[in-house]
């Protein structure tokens, strides 16, 4: 596999994971006590990217709720919908760019094979 194809595929896989992590966070935005995750991209040799997922332990907002036992302080999730939406949009753009890199390299290799025939 050429380095350009490897790089593009690595990007597609990495940004797929970032999108999945943001989707997981958004799906749990209303889950009390949920701690959001962050997908951190790291360089991987040669010319690749790997993803490390970490949990953000920051406390979510606390609200006073009425339960059968009386008033209880409940910690909500620490997910910020605006931040997750922005992360999703950015990851999507990088995902598309990685796909384009694969497409471009595929076309280049096709042209090279045509010349060699």
Say what each PLM segment does.
Residues 1-117:
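Amphipathic alpha-helical polymerization modules
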């Amino acid at each position: 596999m050429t380095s350009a194809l490897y790089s593009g595929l690595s990007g597609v896989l990495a940004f797929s994971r970032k999108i999945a992590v943001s989707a997981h966070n958004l799906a749990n935005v209303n889950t009390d006590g949920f701690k959001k995750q962050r997908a951190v991209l790291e360089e991987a040799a040669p010319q690749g990217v790997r993803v490390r997922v970490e949990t953000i332990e920051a406390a979510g907002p606390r609200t006073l709720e009425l339960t059968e036992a009386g008033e209880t302080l409940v910690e909500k999730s620490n997910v910020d919908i605006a931040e997750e939406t922005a992360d999703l949009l950015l990851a999507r753009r990088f995902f598309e760019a990685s796909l384009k890199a694969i497409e471009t390299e595929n076309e280049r290799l096709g042209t090279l094979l045509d010349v060699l025939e």
